[in-house]
Swiss-Prot record:
It comes from the Bacteria. PSII is composed of 1 copy each of membrane proteins PsbA, PsbB, PsbC, PsbD, PsbE, PsbF, PsbH, PsbI, PsbJ, PsbK, PsbL, PsbM, PsbT, PsbX, PsbY, PsbZ, Psb30/Ycf12, peripheral proteins PsbO, CyanoQ (PsbQ), PsbU, PsbV and a large number of cofactors. It forms dimeric complexes. It comes from Nostoc sp. (strain PCC 7120 / SAG 25.82 / UTEX 2576). Keywords: Membrane, Photosynthesis, Photosystem II, Reaction center, Thylakoid, Transmembrane, Transmembrane helix. This is Photosystem II reaction center protein M.
């Protein structure tokens, strides 16, 4: 299966960008919850 380099990079970014965004949001909310508890 021949994969276009541009398509390959685009598909990786398509998965990575939302994942990183969600991870950052989760870390921010988790750190806020931690500050509330202490």
């Amino acid at each position: 299966m021949q994969v276009n380099d541009l398509g390959f990079v685009a598909s990786i970014l398509f998965v990575l960008v939302p994942s990183v965004f969600l991870i950052i949001l989760y870390i921010q909310t988790a750190s806020r919850e931690g500050k509330k508890d202490s």
